[in-house]
Amino acid sequence: MMKSLFYHFIGIGGIGMSALAHVLLDRGYSVSGSDLSEGKVVEKLKNKGAEFFLGNQEEHIPEGAVVVYSSSISKKNPEFLSAKSRGNRVVHRAELLAELAQDQISIFVTGSHGKTTVSSLITAILQEAKKNPSFAIGGLNQEGINGGSGSEYFVAEADESDGSIRCYTPEFSVITNIDDEHLSNFEGDRELLLASLKDFALKTQQICWYNGDCPRLRSCLQGHTFGLDSSCDLHILSYYQEGWRLYFTAKYQDVVYADIEVQLVGMHNVLNAAAAMGIALSLGIDEGAIRNAFRGFSGVQRRLQRKNSSETFLFLEDYAHHPSEISCTLRAVRTAVGQRRILAIYQPHRFSRLRECIDSFPSAFKDADEVLLTEVYSAGEEAEDISYQKLAEAISQESIVKCTHIPFHELQRHLEQSIRVHDVCVSLGAGNIVNLGEKLRDFEPQKLHLGIICGGKSCEHEISVLSAKNIAKHLSKSFYDVSYFLITREGLWESVSSLETAEDSGKSVFDPEIAQRLEKVDVVLPILHGPYGEDGAMQGFLETIGKPYTGPAIAFSAIAMNKVFTKRFMSDLGIPVVPYLPLTLAGWKQEQDKWLAHIVEAFSFPIFVKSSHLGSSIGVFEVHNVIELRDAINEAFMRDNDVFVEENRLGCKEIEVSVLGDGSGAFVVAGLHERRGSGGFIDYQEKYGLSGKSSAQIVFDTDLSKEIQEQILEAADKIYRLLLGKGSCRIDFFVDEEGNFWLSEMNPIPGMTETSPFLTSFIRKGWSYEQIVHQLVIDGLQRFNQRQRLISTSFVDQAFAIQ
């Protein structure tokens, strides 16, 4: 190409066209272009010297200019017709791309999904390796640039959608995958699409890397493969996602590349990173450059790009518009955010795509909690008659989520009324839904009104209040407003603005003042220990009045606080428990001597007598003879209707494990710790440092072997899963000198005072106090949402039954 040539782009603001315009401008060519609107993409080009025309007019075509068009430009476009009639050279953007890349080592990326991410990753690797590549990519980097001219290499996307990949003969290539996308351009025949990809691979001069996990590609392509399948040339051995980052280990040519970190999310991006890595290794790029590029990758705009400034909720924008892309994106977000409510705002892109994929779209939203469906963005297609209500119903049915049709012009207002603290909003689509995030950039949702309930009728009243005071110190004022409800030892309620001003007096929970203040609360934090607070009673009350609450759910509270039931259930499932013998009040009253004889025969003194429903150090008695045994059992039955005797584990380590989350989904097991007393059994006073006693020592760096620690953590994980744990829990074990361990008991609402190890366990894991509270609130809200969905469904069923 001659230096004096002038290039004019019809539709210069398009993502593919603007990339080539950047390359030409960097190489010193004169560039002009037209488009129907002027945005940030055009502004970047103008800053480089491009001339811009708003709208399409014949007179925009410069004399002697090469005129560039894309497949989206109509042959009836006035500028296209003018260029033809004047005799200007008119080229498709694919032809120009091929020309621009011909004097460099070209690396072209094609496939139904992932082209932009793979080409961006390859570009980042080459830049990290100081190779200064040229690039033309279908997405903007964080600087708003999608094209540029360099030296040795040229990285570009090759658009498979319109068949224009026939123009390319790259040195290296990547085929990411194949899906039923853009089939209308291939006479509705997926085999024609596959044939075009096969031809592209055959024309690759050196190496074609393709997805070895894709059967349709594997059946007809030759080249190097990447994927999870063990037969792949670049074999992904393992991967996991931690927050907003991926880690994977891969093997290529007998070399294992362990724990590669990528600043992306989702299994699909593991494959994308593997494809980029395969190209880089083929080019002889140093492993360090690959790792550094992946670790520092800043991403691509409109690929889970954060749009809002508020710290109390998250608004992400994503380009996903095909069912496969939507599913992968939402699954990645779910893994990153755990139990936070995900609101998916979906704008279908093109009537033809919706029609072609109508059977796949309804099931693509399974990882969302709620879907807002708006009108199709036509992208120039003729409008078709669509029943959005029926599509919303299909999404609700197949993805098991609430889906509502919201007209596009009402989306902003609806979201401003619906978004709450901790929500994650994800806009999905390739159309003008891009504007939604900008409109909500500075939006702030209302704070959540938390109601902390503490005190209670239990003998652990004092610890409950201390725990509540400690939690109150760490509540984020930007997230929450707080009210306090102190339950007296007599069971009366007092509503106060501060626990420091609380008096030991109160009213019935049915008193209008208490009821009205409870009504204003959005989420309740019950920080209660023992009966009437930790055993499901309070949880049942809160569900009855329709309030979300943190911590354990009804069933889990009731089960975990019943030590006999927990032991019996866990023992049946293979978890070792300390040998025990349950007693009933009726049986004990009628046949005390018989039970005493049975106990003495089964156990050796000292023996422990325990109440089944109280805390770990409440209603527990160490006895050394039959007289003490009888008295202790009588005393225990004064505190609880269910009592058991237990073989002693004196001399064993007391090991505790803290857990937060949903046992049927996402939960976190913190590292274990040891509670050491002054000797023998750790009673209530020593546990909390009361009555002049020194607190039991908490040891986090225990001298247990790594193997034993892992076994205990695995057991805690298993116990929480099997019991379908909800909210929070502390799981206690005994461990002897040989490394044998037994489940002791579970505490669904552990102490949360300044010295309580439950909170410290998560602090040592890298959490903040605020994060712990956030997690408790998020878990409670998510559980409430799930229950509300079931309630509303039952009402619908009843309505249909009545009709």
Curated annotation (Swiss-Prot):
GO terms for molecular function: ATP binding; D-alanine-D-alanine ligase activity; metal ion binding; UDP-N-acetylmuramate-L-alanine ligase activity. SUPFAM superfamilies: Glutathione synthetase ATP-binding domain-like, MurCD N-terminal domain, MurD-like peptide ligases, catalytic domain, MurD-like peptide ligases, peptide-binding domain, PreATP-grasp domain. It catalyses: UDP-N-acetyl-alpha-D-muramate + L-alanine + ATP = UDP-N-acetyl-alpha-D-muramoyl-L-alanine + ADP + phosphate + H(+); 2 D-alanine + ATP = D-alanyl-D-alanine + ADP + phosphate + H(+). InterPro entries: ATP-grasp, ATP_grasp_subdomain_1, D-Ala_lig_Van_CS, D_ala_D_ala, Dala_Dala_lig_C, Dala_Dala_lig_N, Mur-like_cat_sf, Mur_ligase_C. Transmembrane segments: none annotated. Its EC number is 6.3.2.8, 6.3.2.4. It is an enzyme of class 6 (ligase). Keywords: ATP-binding, Cell cycle, Cell division, Cell shape, Cell wall biogenesis/degradation, Cytoplasm, Ligase, Magnesium, Manganese, Metal-binding, Multifunctional enzyme, Nucleotide-binding, Peptidoglycan synthesis. Its cofactor is Mg(2+); Mn(2+). Binds 2 magnesium or manganese ions per subunit. This is Bifunctional enzyme MurC/Ddl. It comes from Chlamydia trachomatis serovar D (strain ATCC VR-885 / DSM 19411 / UW-3/Cx). The lineage of its organism: Bacteria, Pseudomonadati, Chlamydiota, Chlamydiia, Chlamydiales.
